[in-house]
Amino acid sequence: MTFRAASDQIEVPAGVGLTAVGMAWVRARESARRDRLFDDPYAEAFVEAAGGPAAAGPAGAFARFIDVVDSHGVQRTRFFDDYLTRAADAGQRQFVLLAAGLDTRAHRLSWPAGTRLFEVDLPEMLTFKQAVLDTRHATARAERITVPADLAGDWSSALTRAGLRPRERTTWLVEGLLPYLDAEAAAHLLTTVGELSVPGSLLGFEYQADTWLLDELRATPELAEFATLLKGGLGESPLDWLPRHGWQVLQARLRSELAAEAGRPAPGPLADGFLVATRR
């Protein structure tokens, strides 16, 4: 899947940031279904601003890759929608989305009064996102605080300067990020999250239990460049890593399980999933 800029007035994110446009395309397609699992009324606007999707490459491995991305993106979005909603219903009022990308949950989910939602991402991503949201006159349903920061740098200082209250419980979402980090960087990021989290804080992220997807990408010439962006994440099961670092896993669900419950197919590997943990 490739995207081209539709206008010189809005700069489209590049590199890993471009994958956020791809996920917006997945959400736009799902939102157009009569049996949709969620509704993102802004997703299509991001795709349009990027010039629209254009399929690249032959059938076969590429087609299977697109199907897996679509399935993963749909189930991931619904799972974490429910995760954030349940946290808010349980009294959590401080939320942080790391690598927020083109996430529009601040605008499309219902939030209790007093909710503060921090979106951390690169300045160019946040600028693109806001420019598109402005064209749709989008209004956030919670106090939305954008934090321009590189997650490879000292993002925690930027977050606290923006108003994060580390002594309060925080609900963290690390969505679509860890696969683009190597084991050391992924562990460092999650360790930093832990240092900013008091007991009762929550953490949600996705996990991949095998290398099928990366192997498939590397074996497909049209996708080899994208494959270089993927670093593998933690390198071990988060079900083992989290308990050693002060977290208790509350929920871990495979994509295939969620898809079956929704009456949807689950193409590709069956070992990817999503989890929620709480700080001990």
Swiss-Prot record:
The keyword Transmembrane does not apply. It comes from the Bacteria. This is Putative S-adenosyl-L-methionine-dependent methyltransferase FRAAL3836. Belongs to the UPF0677 family. The keyword Chaperone does not apply. Keywords: Methyltransferase, S-adenosyl-L-methionine, Transferase. GO terms for biological process: methylation. Its EC number is 2.1.1.-. Gene3D superfamilies: Vaccinia Virus protein VP39 (3.40.50.150). It is an enzyme of class 2 (transferase). Exhibits S-adenosyl-L-methionine-dependent methyltransferase activity. GO terms for molecular function: methyltransferase activity. It holds the Pfam family LCM. S-adenosyl-L-methionine binds at D121, D150, L151.
